[in-house]
Amino acid sequence: MEHLQPSSFTDILELLPGGRSKDPDLSSPNTIRIREAGSPSGYTTTSLGTSFVVDGAPISTNANMQYVAGSWDAATTSRENMNAGVDMRSISTDDIEKVEVVRGIPSVEYGDLTSGLVKIERRRGGNDWNARLKADMGSKLFYLAKGLEWTPQQMTLNLSVDYLDAKADPRNRLENYRRLTFSARFGKTWLTDFYRWKISSNLDYTGSFDNDKVDPDLNNQAEDSYKSQYNKYAFNSHVSLSPKKRIWFKSLDLTLSASYEYDLIKRTKLVQLTRQTVAATATTQGVHDGVILPYKYVACHDVEGKPLNLYAKVNGKFQVPSLVVSNTLLLGTDWNYDKNKGRGQIYDVTRPLYAGSMSCRPRNLSSIPSNQQWGIYAEEQLTLPFAGHSLELVAGIRGTQMLNLPNNYEMHGKFFWDPRINLGLTFPKFNIGKLPSFIRIAGGIGEHTKMPTLEQLYPDPVYLDLTQLNYYHTNPAYRRINLMTYVIDATNQNLK
């Protein structure tokens, strides 16, 4: 990572087998693509199905409903990231100690994924100052961190701040992406006569700001701007209990995390119409009169989201004490809660941003039920040495159920079971010249399940407005447009 001098987590993926080196593009969301050939336009299943786990807690995007309804212009659509997984631009790299990318079959401990798993562990301990300055044609980055470690008390504290300012074109100061992160990580270990207690707690802030504005001098003094801000506040705590002696009980782990976001999109544009256009304002099905729009007006369209995520996990590891066979039995359960408390699409329906193509109405996101998942899992890890060989077996099963679903959904009350198995055989070691070598054959098979997001479970209703009468008169007071409005429920209750 020091060799790459990364600006975001996207750059680290160059180190993966088959990874390509390319210039960073921070003007649009960076989503991960693993186990995928090519990048089909609009196909985000791979990135949505990849789980990012930072210090033991997953990053959830299930409540992300940030999109501008009815948008068709590239300035807006190219920056949307709904149902597309984690935007890697928001992940700072300077605090990272270790990254593990699992493109095969992960442990049953990890659920709500299909494509892969990215495990990130951040640096802890030390007493050094760390700083990094980076400047190139497209971006400027500043990072400062301080580690504090009290050895007698077995306590650590790490503080860090990171700021990034990137431009798609260094000549254009009106389009830029900025990121600001702050992290405080605390760790403490207690020792008793029989057990070792360890606690790790994190407090993080991530701010991501995406701006694009057309120069008024080049746009006939017309306003045309896009502003997006993402503010995330997160807390994560991990408690571990392990015995000092080798007994049947290995460890007990508890992970708790909570995150709250304030996301806001502001799109402002001068709308100029070439013909008489109507704005539909009805929210119920039936016959209604539309509002005839002026030929020129300034439209303001905001999207407010307030995703809330809560996560809890309990793991227990057990073993049969043996000097020959290494074994670990993992038993655990986890619970995940997602809710969006934002106001959603906020705009004047009589002055729409995309006149003539609006098939939606303002909707308060807080009225959407929460998305809750409960998982249980069990896994056995076994290593058996024989005749200089070593046989490794990891086999387990995971069950996941969606809670808080209405009774008319196909997924209501059902458990989705994911059996997974990995098997490896390591042959005796040998030397090639003076170099020690070995051969290992491994394979596996398993099932993964990704649960639907809030938007997929509860999509916006579709409004179909058909013109029945269009009467034009030279006197504007006599003009009238009558519409027949159909409200189409886009909910797919047969998701499974």
Stretches with model-predicted labels:
Residues 48, 116, 140-144, 178-184, ...:
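Hydrophobic, lipid-facing positions within transmembrane beta-strands of outer-membrane proteins
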Residues 135-139, 150, 161-167, 203-211, ...:
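Transmembrane beta-strands of outer-membrane beta-barrel pores
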Residues 10-70:
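Extracytoplasmic beta-strand/coil segments of soluble accessory domains associated
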Residues 367-496:
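Structural signature of Gram-negative outer-membrane beta-barrels, strongest in the C-terminal barrel
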Residues 130-165, 172-255, 259:
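Transmembrane beta-barrel wall of Gram-negative outer-membrane proteins
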Residues 12, 31-33, 53, 85-89, ...:
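N-terminal periplasmic accessory domains that precede
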Residues 57-102:
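Short acidic/polar hinge/loop motifs at secondary-structure boundaries
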Residues 190-208, 226-409:
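Face-selective signature of the C-terminal outer-membrane beta-barrel domain
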